[in-house]
Amino acid sequence: AVDVGADYVVVDGFGGGTGAAPVHVRDHVGIPSWVALHRARAWLDDHDHADVQLVVTGGYRTPDEMAKAMALGADAVALATASMMAIGCQQYRACHRGTCPVGIATQNPVLRSRLDPAVSAERLTRFLLAATEMMTDYARITGRSSLGELARKDLAALRPDVAALLDIDVRA
């Protein structure tokens, strides 16, 4: 994709999931998002494509996870499950049947009427604003003035195997 001029690449690790995915696929196909992110950023940088934006997704739910992803080289973090939870998903795991009782993953008009788009939009807005504020705090704590300045050297691992896998320092 980058060889034909793509502006960005989205890498999706297996840490996320959709309620519509079969369990055997969701749990056993792919590699962890952190590893996929590290490998993708290294490849882009090593092949003169550092200008290509890297978007990562797959299991990122909390601001600390998102900030770490940015420090590992993501230019953006796409959220699915976290956004669904923010708008009211209660994880009934009925997405694949189209019978979501809270009205999110359905085309059934009766079920859809249970979701108030204005309330859901406000909840999502509050979640994203709070997450951004917390990520900005993480950047400041490391001496950075913005999220975009977070870098791999701002991270440390407690486990040597994780440090080696992600090319970060070990602090025990």
Question: Which residue ranges define each predicted feature?
Answer:
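Glycine-rich phosphate/ribose-binding loops and adjacent secondary-structure elements
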Residues: 1-112
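C-terminal extensions of enzymes
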Residues: 88, 116-172
